[in-house]
């Protein structure tokens, strides 16, 4: 949690993909609240750091948060720091500085897994998108992502407040009925169903062990993100807690935070 909060309070622009696996309805809204709080803190920190020392900030960088799942129903996350081409290289790149091409940024992408042992056998997002082996080898060979340690006092206060917010949300998650944790790994019991569909085929993941996963034929990440949709059902939250909405349907979006 401290690693995620330090990334969210970093001074770089952040791209958040609204996808969260194996979560209950109340923790889904908690993550929305956390992203709203972290967006304001990241905007303030980026403006203050650029005014003080602009050479320490990587130009036109972003972090792409993608959530996937493993065969043992334990979610792990992919953190991909993406970097646009330098605007001072050519005049044509200055015109295209507002557009973030994911396929052209794969040379600067890094991969960080919370369960690295399950990477070869798990259906990761790279395997689902049918990326070539050269790009997969490039992502696996890149070094781990390092967070900038030079932060001002306002950045440290924002990161500490985010850590307190995470602890408070975890405390509420334990107290509110409907969520259960295992004593060994502190993993929340899956209580929602995630459905993601593309133009050619669909990807499904639920709490049952017999869930089947089919890989889409599209190899473009932008086309897949633009066509995703999710459905969260609150029927398995418990008898003592009833949600006024039976299901929530929406579309995935990509939002750039910061300058």
Curated annotation (Swiss-Prot):
The keyword Transmembrane helix applies. Its main location: membrane. It is a multi-pass membrane protein. The keyword Membrane applies. Keywords: Membrane, Transmembrane, Transmembrane helix. It is found in: Membrane. The chain crosses the membrane at residues 14-34, 161-181, 221-241. One of its GO terms (cellular component) is membrane. It comes from the Eukaryota. Almost completely overlaps SPT6. This is Putative uncharacterized protein YGR115C. It comes from Saccharomyces cerevisiae (strain ATCC 204508 / S288c) (Baker's yeast).
């Amino acid at each position: 949690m401290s690693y995620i909060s330090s990334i969210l309070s970093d001074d770089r622009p952040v791209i958040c993909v609204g996808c969260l696996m194996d979560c209950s309805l109340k923790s889904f809204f908690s993550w929305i609240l956390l992203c709203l709080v972290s967006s304001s803190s990241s905007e303030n920190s980026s403006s203050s750091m650029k005014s003080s020392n602009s050479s320490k900030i990587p130009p036109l960088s972003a972090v792409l948060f993608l959530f996937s799942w493993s065969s043992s129903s334990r979610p792990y996350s992919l953190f991909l720091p993406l970097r646009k081409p330098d605007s001072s290289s050519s005049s044509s790149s200055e015109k295209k500085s507002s557009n973030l091409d994911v396929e052209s940024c794969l040379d600067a992408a890094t991969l960080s897994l919370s369960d690295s042992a399950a990477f070869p056998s798990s259906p990761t997002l790279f395997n689902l998108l049918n990326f070539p082996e050269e790009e997969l080898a490039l992502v696996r060979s890149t070094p781990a992502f390092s967070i900038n340690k030079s932060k001002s006092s306002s950045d440290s206060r924002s990161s500490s407040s985010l850590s307190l917010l995470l602890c408070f949300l975890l405390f509420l998650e334990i107290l509110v009925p409907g969520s259960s944790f295992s004593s060994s790994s502190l993993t929340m019991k899956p209580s929602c169903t995630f459905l993601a569909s593309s133009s050619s085929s669909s990807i499904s993941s639920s709490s049952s062990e017999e869930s089947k996963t089919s890989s889409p034929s599209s190899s473009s990440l932008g086309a897949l993100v633009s066509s995703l949709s999710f459905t969260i059902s609150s029927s398995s939250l418990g008898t003592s807690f009833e949600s006024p909405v039976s299901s929530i349907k929406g579309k995935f979006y990509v939002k750039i935070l910061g300058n």
